[in-house]
Amino acid sequence: MQLNELNCVILCGGKSSRMGQDKSKLILKNQNLTQFQVEKFSKIFKNVYVSAKEDKFENHFSLIKDSLEFEVYSPMLALYSILSNFKNEFVFVLSVDSPKVGENELLKMLPFLEQNYKIIIAKTPLHKHPLCGFYHSSLAQTCKNFLEKNEQKIGLLFSEIKTKFVEFEDEDAFLNLNFYEEYEKFKSELR
């Protein structure tokens, strides 16, 4: 299996409460963070989609909207909505605010898709990264079951589904832009 045979979905529906503004629209090199991620991953994957509650990008991207079945704002709803759009395949899911994840990290996770796992996510010494990994589309129903019980955390899947945590040493590769200072620092590194 090759990365260019797979689909990628960039999650852009978070509340961005710590950032104080919509992270998906932060500007990097004359484009917003969503464009930055879509452009980068379009060179790697078959298709790149954007997941959000509504189309805040004016049809600029292939959009997967959150399901209206549940009136919540959560990563589990986004994952359910994403996986419901695919059949019998793995999908790479990444939050928009992880701009340093790239092909090297993906290639380290890729071999595990051929093994007997349904979830393959990145793990560093300090954190598991549930919004950086491959999820099999067959998990949509499991996500729905959690939502029906008002369980919103993606981490709940790991105890029920065969999951591979792929170990990475470099915390920096999985940087999340949660605060404005982190965004400013990352922006200055791009110059």
Swiss-Prot record:
Binding positions (GTP): 11-13, 23, 66, 97
Main location: cytoplasm
Disulphide-bridged cysteine pairs: none
Swiss-Prot/TrEMBL cofactor(s): Mg(2+)
Pfam family, one: NTP_transf_3
EC code: 2.7.7.77
Family annotation (InterPro entries): MobA-like_NTP_Trfase, Molybde_CF_guanTrfase, Nucleotide-diphossugar_trans
Transmembrane portions of the chain: none
Gene Ontology cellular component annotations, sorted alphabetically: cytoplasm
UniProt subcellular location: Cytoplasm
Binding site residues for Mg(2+): 97
UniProt keyword terms in alphabetical order: Cytoplasm, GTP-binding, Magnesium, Metal-binding, Molybdenum cofactor biosynthesis, Nucleotide-binding, Transferase
Biological process annotations from GO: bis(molybdopterin guanine dinucleotide)molybdenum biosynthetic process
Reactions that this protein is recorded to catalyse: Mo-molybdopterin + GTP + H(+) = Mo-molybdopterin guanine dinucleotide + diphosphate
GO molecular function: GTP binding; metal ion binding; molybdenum cofactor guanylyltransferase activity
Subunit structure: Monomer.
Function: Transfers a GMP moiety from GTP to Mo-molybdopterin (Mo-MPT) cofactor (Moco or molybdenum cofactor) to form Mo-molybdopterin guanine dinucleotide (Mo-MGD) cofactor.
Family in the record: Belongs to the MobA family.
Entry domain remark: The N-terminal domain determines nucleotide recognition and specific binding, while the C-terminal domain determines the specific binding to the target protein.
Protein name (record): Molybdenum cofactor guanylyltransferase
Source organism (scientific name): Campylobacter jejuni subsp. jejuni serotype O:6 (strain 81116 / NCTC 11828)
